[in-house]
Design a protein with these regions (language model features):
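Glycine-rich beta-strand-to-loop/alpha-helix junction loops that act as flexible
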Residues: 101-102, 136-146, 176
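Short loop/edge segments at beta-strand edges and connector loops
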Residues: 14, 176-177
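Metal-dependent catalytic neighborhoods of phosphoester/phosphodiester hydrolases
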Residues: 108-109, 146-151
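Active-site-proximal beta-alpha core segment in soluble small-molecule metabolic enzymes
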Residues: 1-135, 159, 163, 170
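Active-site loop ensemble at the mouth of alpha/beta enzyme cores that anchors a bound cofactor
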Residues: 71, 150-165, 173-176
Length: 177
């Protein structure tokens, strides 16, 4: 915000946060928060009412990332669904799904697998609860060139966009970090 970024464009993307941080962000105009736990969701509802929330799901990164982060934060798909239903009941706006495939991920197809997990959450929420999500935060994980030759970030982005086009028939906003 101090750098001139509009608060409407900022996502509070950490699943571990203090109530005072949620309140501070909300008071500054931030209205998009990630969650992966009931207690955190309750905190968001209390200190950031009517905000949009997205849920971080656990995904497998396999052995193709140098630093697996896919299981460090997040919840399973059923808990993600339950949290989004609860969010709606608490006056929050269920908005999307987040995941991280691990840092220095060398296999672009891992994003496809993670996007399939996100799609399962999207579909079940819409079919069983009438909740239509709008966002996927696919985290980071893009490899940087060190010693080994790697595909360019543009190549990764093109493949991920193809996966999105294949899996999601309606408009979904995609965040990549």
């Amino acid at each position: 915000i101090d750098c001139g970024i509009s608060p409407e464009r900022i996502s509070f993307g950490n699943t571990i946060k203090k109530a005072s941080d949620v309140k501070y962000a909300y008071d500054k105009g931030i209205r998009l928060f990630v969650t992966d736990a009931q207690a955190d969701l309750e905190q968001i509802a209390q200190y950031a009412p009517n905000s949009r929330v997205f849920v971080r799901v656990l995904v497998e990164s396999g052995s193709t990332s140098d630093w697996p982060l896919s299981r460090k934060f997040g919840c399973d798909t059923q808990m993600a669904i339950d949290l989004m239903v609860k969010a709606k009941q608490m006056g929050l706006q269920p908005y999307g799904v987040s995941f991280h495939v691990g840092s220095q991920q060398n296999n672009v197809t891992v994003w496809r697998t993670a996007l399939k997990t996100a799609k399962a959450v999207f579909e079940k929420l819409e079919k069983e609860h009438g909740i239509q999500l709008e966002l996927i935060n696919a985290g980071g994980g893009f490899p940087a060139q060190y010693l080994a030759e790697i595909d360019s970030i543009q190549d990764y982005a093109k493949r991920i966009q193809c996966y999105m086009d294949d899996l999601f028939q309606h408009k979904v906003t995609l965040f990549l970090e």
